[in-house]
Amino acid sequence: MTSNLNLLQRSCALLLAGAALAFMGCDDTKPAPPAQPKTSQFETGRFALQKMIPAARSWSPDANPIQLTSSTNSESIGHDGKSGFWRAVFASPARGKSEPFSWSGLVDPDVPRGVNHGVEDTYSAANRSMMTWDLNYLKVDTDQAFETAQQHGGKTLLEKESKLPVTYLLDFDAMSHQLRWHVIYGTPAKLTVFVDASSGNFLRKE
């Protein structure tokens, strides 16, 4: 009887050991696959500005933009009205301060993705060259502004120089009371086309 009991105990022990080994084998985790590299994101000026607004309004509830500018790089030269990096300056008339904000979609260790901000500076609402403007007036985005600029000299220029970078600047002209896009061909500029950012109409070129 005792020998049978010992045999049964040894059998149970072997079964438990086998089960434990099987469990440990199943528990072995495979190494995670390497993370896929991120790709850069390119967006229009209005898209980038809308991304910056919450951060600017958090900085100051009355903040409105003064200026918006794009940058080009080896991945994007602005021919579709898009950029991977946009910079805006917002101002708070109530506080008498301005602050730069930026949006980046680039894969660059030196340029963090998303919205960031710079150093606060002084601001005077009396300076007509630094007037803020209401976002409701921005009806026309950079892709549309580019198409308009193409019809007024841009297309001819790019046919000659297909790699010429195109950058964008948005500001308010106090003299004409117009919110306008500057579509700038080349650095330094070989052609600048001004487009009404509310109506999309061609204004002038230089």
Please annotate each region the language model reported:
Residues 2-13:
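Bacterial N-terminal signal peptides that target proteins for export
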Residues 5, 25-206:
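Long, terminal "pre-/pro-" and other extracytoplasmic accessory regions
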